[in-house]
């Protein structure tokens, strides 16, 4: 909210698809309420980014099997590093643990904070849902410690099977 009041773009992390849409609307409304022109609001919305974890395979099960355990391992490692190195009096936002496979429904749920993980059809649907709630820019990372081959295959599927749908 404070960044919207001064017209600065932000990076939105985490949240469900619908939660992300709510944050974008709050940002837009706050910026408008602070007296910025419609053009200035649009320019800032064009510079607003949403950060998601991503892993794509041919099928949902393959992606879940490749990524989720590796993502949990990376999460645990980072939590250990934070506990060791962050000063105890330092206030930091607590990172939410990644969802387990059983938390992913057959189709993406816009009210659950899902990573963008699955077969390319599922992830295409997730990108479309984010676009529908106002996301214009996505920063996608692969936090799981998957092999270089699997990461490269995921990126290839992103560029060949998903991105052409959104050009």
What are these regions (language model features)?
Residues 1, 20, 58, 148-149:
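Short catalytic/ligand-binding loop motif for oxyanion handling, primarily in non-cytosolic enzymes
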Residues 19-135:
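An alpha-helical appendage that flanks or caps ligand/catalytic pockets
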Residues 155-167:
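Alpha-helix-loop-beta-strand connector modules within alpha/beta enzyme cores
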Residues 1-28:
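A conserved active-site cap/scaffold subdomain adjacent to cofactor or substrate pockets
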Residues 6, 129-136, 165-166:
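A structural motif corresponding to the C-terminal end of an alpha-helix
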Residues 14-15, 85, 139-155:
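Glycine-rich, proline-tolerant flexible connector loops at the mouths of alpha/beta enzymes
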Residues 8-13, 46-53, 138-142:
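Hydrophobic faces of well-ordered beta-strands that scaffold small-molecule active sites
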């Amino acid at each position: 909210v404070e960044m919207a009041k001064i017209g600065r773009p932000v990076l939105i992390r985490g949240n469900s698809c619908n939660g992300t849409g709510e944050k974008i609307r709050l940002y837009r409304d706050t910026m408008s309420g602070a007296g910025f022109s419609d053009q200035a609001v649009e320019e800032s919305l064009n510079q607003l980014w949403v950060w998601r974890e991503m892993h794509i395979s041919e099928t949902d099960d393959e992606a879940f099997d490749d990524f989720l355990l590796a993502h949990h391992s990376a999460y645990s490692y980072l939590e250990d590093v934070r506990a060791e190195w962050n000063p105890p009096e330092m206030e930091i936002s607590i990172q939410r643990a990644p969802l387990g496979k059983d938390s992913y429904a057959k189709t993406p749920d816009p009210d659950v904070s899902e990573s963008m993980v699955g077969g390319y059809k599922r992830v295409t649907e997730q990108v479309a849902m984010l676009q529908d709630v106002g996301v214009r820019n996505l920063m996608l990372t692969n936090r799981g410690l998957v092999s270089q081959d699997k990461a490269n295959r995921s990126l290839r599927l992103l560029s060949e099977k998903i991105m052409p749908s959104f050009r």
